[in-house]
Design a protein with these regions (language model features):
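A glycine-rich dinucleotide-binding beta-alpha-beta segment and adjacent secondary-structure elements
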Residues: 196-252
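A structural signal for well-ordered alpha-helical segments within the folded catalytic domains
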Residues: 63-70, 146-149, 188, 260-263
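Aromatic-enriched alpha-helical interface/lid elements that frame and gate functional surfaces
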Residues: 126-201
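Flexible, small-/acidic-enriched active-site or ligand-binding loops
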Residues: 52, 161, 231-280
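Non-catalytic accessory regions
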Residues: 277-290
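Beta-rich nucleic-acid/ligand-interaction surfaces
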Residues: 96, 170, 209-216, 287
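Active-site-adjacent "lid/gating" segments in soluble enzymes
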Residues: 1-138, 142
Length: 290
């Protein structure tokens, strides 16, 4: 896996996280493909900087990791089926093209890509953030027709009439109508009334990221974090396994320290103990002391 593919003048060039994000458009898409055209004051610059950093952080490398994992699994599957291994070539540009597949190709009659609104609240009136009473927020996610119907039925049961037809529209009138409904109660009320009934609506501002990973009941029930011991830092919580094949989480270790496995790797490729010790003494290889 590299940045620019196996051939051509860029094959040996390094590539870092922001490059494919910028070239493939994923970062700008997260911002609604909007950038200010006028000179900004300091508060506005801070807002746009925050948006840019958040849009970039979750894009190019995670997209590439998804494609690397999928490609490795496909290769292993092919090996298992055919008995033959094969070389798999992946690059960051291609990986991010896959992640932006809904807008990477252009053809006559192609439907436009769903775009975030100017305030970056969401993609559609039925898939966005809404402010509620007590300065709280919910995220509503009812993209399918059956989900819209369930949402409308639940509102009716709460004494709030809503025409299901408007939920299919993508306009400010629908946003305004739903905004007025959600402002009537706080986020805790809406989550309690809608989520247990199968309506995708949850409070969106309950925790900061750190508090979420440490204290959210859903995180704990899914074992999304796991305690471990780092040789330098001591006991800490790390993320749990992203994929499990059973009822329990595997035991996960901390990340390796710098050079931790250098001696093992050199031994695997034929270096004897004396040669490895000499490389360490010369400073050719180095390992971090715990």
């Amino acid at each position: 896996m590299n940045g620019y593919g196996p051939d051509g003048p860029g094959a040996q060039r390094p590539s870092t996280h922001p490059i494919p994000g910028a070239a493939m458009g994923g970062v700008l898409y997260q911002m609604g493909e909007r950038m200010p055209e006028q000179q900004q004051d300091i508060p506005a610059l801070r807002t746009w900087t925050r948006r840019l950093m958040r849009a970039n952080e979750l894009n190019p490398d995670p997209n590439t990791a998804m494609v690397v994992c999928s490609s490795a699994l496909l290769g292993l599957n092919a090996l298992q089926r055919t008995g033959k291994g094969q070389r798999i070539l992946i690059d960051m540009f291609g990986a991010n093209a896959y992640a932006n597949h809904d807008d990477f190709l252009s053809y006559p009659g192609k439907a436009p890509r769903a775009m975030p609104d100017e305030g970056l609240h969401g993609l559609h009136p039925s898939y966005r953030l809404y402010a509620t009473a007590e300065d709280q927020w919910v995220f509503l996610a009812v993209p399918e027709e059956k989900e819209k119907k369930r949402f409308a039925e639940r509102l009716t049961a709460l004494g709030i009439e809503v025409d299901i037809a408007i939920l299919t529209r993508n306009d400010e009138t629908t946003v305004g109508h739903l905004s007025e409904i959600f402002k009537g109660k706080n986020a805790e009320f809406w989550e309690a009334q809608l989520a247990p009934q199968g309506v995708g609506c949850v409070r969106a501002d309950r925790y900061s990221p750190v508090e979420f990973w440490w204290h959210d009941p859903q995180v704990q029930s899914l074992n999304l974090t796991q305690p471990t011991e780092h040789p330098a830092w001591g006991a800490y919580d790390r993320h749990g396994a992203n994929v499990t094949f059973g009822r329990s989480q595997p035991t996960l270790k901390p990340p390796p320290t710098a050079g931790q496995h250098a001696e093992e790797l050199l031994a695997e490729i034929g270096y004897d103990s004396a040669s490895i010790a000499k490389l360490l003494a010369q400073g050719t290889i180095w390992k971090e002391q715990a």
